[in-house]
Amino acid sequence: MLAAAQEGSEVAFSRLWRDGNPALLRYLRVIAPEAAEDVAADTWLQVVRGLAGFRGTEQGWRAWLFTTARRRAIDEARRRSRRPEKALEETLPSRLPVSPDTADLALEHVDTRSALSLVASLPAHQAEVILLRVVAGLDNETVARLLGRSPGAVRVAAHRGLRRLAGILAEADVTL
């Protein structure tokens, strides 16, 4: 599939997008909540531009996708810190579109939203490690390279983050 997308197959690229975008958005909603969709769009634009030159495996491609997203999120955070925020009323449309299945979709994703919310409450480095390991499905060594840390530091951050999540859930007597 990756090779076909690199050769210009729209069907193959569409499949890469369908397979990768949900996890990418879940990751970005935690590390860049105010701009997740914008950062995802920038990420995919960068992927389109660089896909033909990418050399590696499917797992390497996932790592490249999330590395690109992380860099775009950092760029967006810098950009936002330099410009004043618009008033909320200016950014919202006057009427939000409603889909007949919106309620069903909301119910379907309630557990995912709760879990992501809990992960977002962790220290940033622990949350990012957990998201890259669990949501993105990357291995320890890949996450370590992506974040510029040692595999041991990644394991420790994941362990501490998961232990903290377990404590939060035990205190609240919550099941996801």
What spans do the regions from the language model cover?
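Amphipathic, Lys/Arg- and hydrophobic-enriched alpha-helical face
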Residues: 16-34, 50, 119, 171
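Short, charged helix-capping/linker segments at alpha-helix termini
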Residues: 6-15, 25-42, 55, 176
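Structural recognition of an alpha-helix C-terminal capping motif at a helix-to-coil junction
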Residues: 38-45, 59-71
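Short amphipathic alpha-helical boundary/capping segments
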Residues: 1-4, 114-123
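Pre-recognition alpha-helix immediately N-terminal to the DNA-recognition helix
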Residues: 23, 114-117, 127-128
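Arg/Lys-rich amphipathic alpha helix in sigma70-family domain 2
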Residues: 30, 49-56, 66-88, 108
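DNA-recognition helix of helix-turn-helix
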Residues: 70, 74, 126, 135, ...
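Internal acidic/polar
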Residues: 83-112, 139
